[in-house]
Amino acid sequence: MDSHSYSRLPDVKGYAWFIFDQVNWYRSQSAAYTERNGGKPLPALAFFHIPLPEYNQAAADESAILIGTRMEKACAPLLNTGMFAAMKEAGDVMGTFVGHDHDNDYSVMWHGILLAYGRFTGGNTEYNHLQNDARVILMKENVRTFTTWIRTKGGEIVDKTIYPDSYRKDDWRKRPPVGEK
């Protein structure tokens, strides 16, 4: 989904936000898929460029488990038009994946939805303190879980997590390391 670029309102500086038509389109598409699936939301992921304002809320929450690198505040829009709330209400989106901030590759759970960054993959830009790598996502059809990690150019797997298990604070110390049973 297109998260646009810069604010079109002269008195609101910074980055753009999803417009209401986009939020409504998502709501109608989600409802249609849920209805076709017998009233049960289909597990889904969302991909867009600019992070939602909730990325900063989640990253600042001391009770949240943040996995990965956060070297800068999310450059999110100043206005919030409710896309995250729409996803939460619909119950289909398990995680959102964004880019935009070259010095972030973290993932953090916020109200049951994983908010994650990809990894800087472009060329030489204004700033890039992380090396070019990639976020990999492995989903299973019709199951509300996925595994994600950063894969380095050298083939190393970094920050491998399983949604939602890796982000449960209540018993995370009792769980085996990722990849072990």
Regions found by a protein language model. Name each.
Residues 11-105, 175-176:
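His/acidic metal-ligating clusters that form di-metal
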Residues 4-6, 51-53, 120-123, 142:
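Short, solvent-exposed loop/turn segments at secondary-structure junctions
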Residues 1, 46, 51, 135, ...:
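Structured catalytic/translocation cores of nucleotide/phosphate-coupled proteins
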Residues 3, 97-100, 150-153:
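Acidic carboxylate-rich catalytic motifs and surrounding loops in phosphoryl-/glycosyl-chemistry enzymes
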